[in-house]
């Protein structure tokens, strides 16, 4: 099955040809927008979130056809298979059960196992938060350093920063991911080993970057006076390979388990989120899970026509596969969500950046768009120029938090006004005639530069307040969007073979950087020249 062979796909193409030149400005014109208004007709809600899809280049017929495509592609079947614990990651022969990590039904897959591990996490987190857990000199823990990369870093880091207003002031959480020593060294300058807990997170506990940083931090502890026998007070591990954690030197009782049926980029709900639980506490962590579970239930139970992940995913396909958009922007108007775009980059591009279909044939259509973003209003002063007047159409997801999580409440109307005004300006634009009036009769040559094409599509997601629950729902919304799109593209959203080749060659090149000249492997001329240049620099 390919998307092009779906019965509704050709109908959608015909529909696209019919409306592709229509301007949203005309759709919103009062004479064309009777009650119920376009805003009312394209407003949807689920999982505690609200979505305004009205400023997209869609009609009711568009949504009807997009939903038909989703249904014909088997979105419902694949969704149900995922929740049931069936194999939906066929290349690795695995179930995909991040939803089980937040399930409340005792009949859910691995329910008892998940609950037991979370209870262990909660006991430990409470000990650290209360000061009961002490370092080797008897001081309480005041610094937590999470060492991981990819899903072992991006999710926890995003959540801890987003919910900083809920975090205990007694503990500062740092995240180290890059194998560049500057990343770890910078954190070392800010912590005291006597008051530091390191959480080493790696599914295999063999990840190059993570283990390099873990060993360096362990050596630093010892250099600063921590006896090797006391390292158990300062190091814990999270892994699906407990034996390797113990081999590293972490005490068996300090090992928290994750499982191979949870992908890294979907793992913050597991023990991978231990740094989150220590920061915000077990009760708030449960709220995070509850919000995600609420979105899970919405995704599972709501009809496709009113299903937020389905609508968000299918509108993304509309722009990617029909309008030819190569990227889409995530613009959270919340500084607390600063790391959300980078988290979504991995979630979407590592999941759906694939060229091989499930049957092994190559796709002949675009898959994942480039995901990028920056919080508002910062982005307005960086790249919104291109969004408004550039020749490339970039769909945008605006995320607006309606009430602030901080005491500077007078700032918030300004923030929200900018968010809503940007969506309006991108939609309505400015015509040449309007631009001439702005330019004035004495500067007619300026008018073309003041034209805004408009008709730039945006979705606005509304969050009442940035709570652990609402954040959980927001994350789960995008998780399920990934499954929807991957199903329609007929690809495996849950493997990541694209990261493997670089790892393999990286080990060869690393050896070549320090090997005797006679042992350096043959590479292409470019790589060989780079290695030679680096070898010379490293000898200085």
Curated annotation (Swiss-Prot):
One of its GO terms (molecular function) is glucose-6-phosphate isomerase activity. It catalyses: alpha-D-glucose 6-phosphate = beta-D-fructose 6-phosphate. Its main location: cytoplasm. It comes from Paraburkholderia phytofirmans (strain DSM 17436 / LMG 22146 / PsJN) (Burkholderia phytofirmans). Pathway: Carbohydrate biosynthesis; gluconeogenesis; Carbohydrate degradation; glycolysis; D-glyceraldehyde 3-phosphate and glycerone phosphate from D-glucose: step 2/4. It is found in: Cytoplasm. This is Glucose-6-phosphate isomerase. The active site is at 350 (proton donor), 381, 503. The gene is pgi. GO terms for biological process: gluconeogenesis; glucose 6-phosphate metabolic process; glycolytic process.
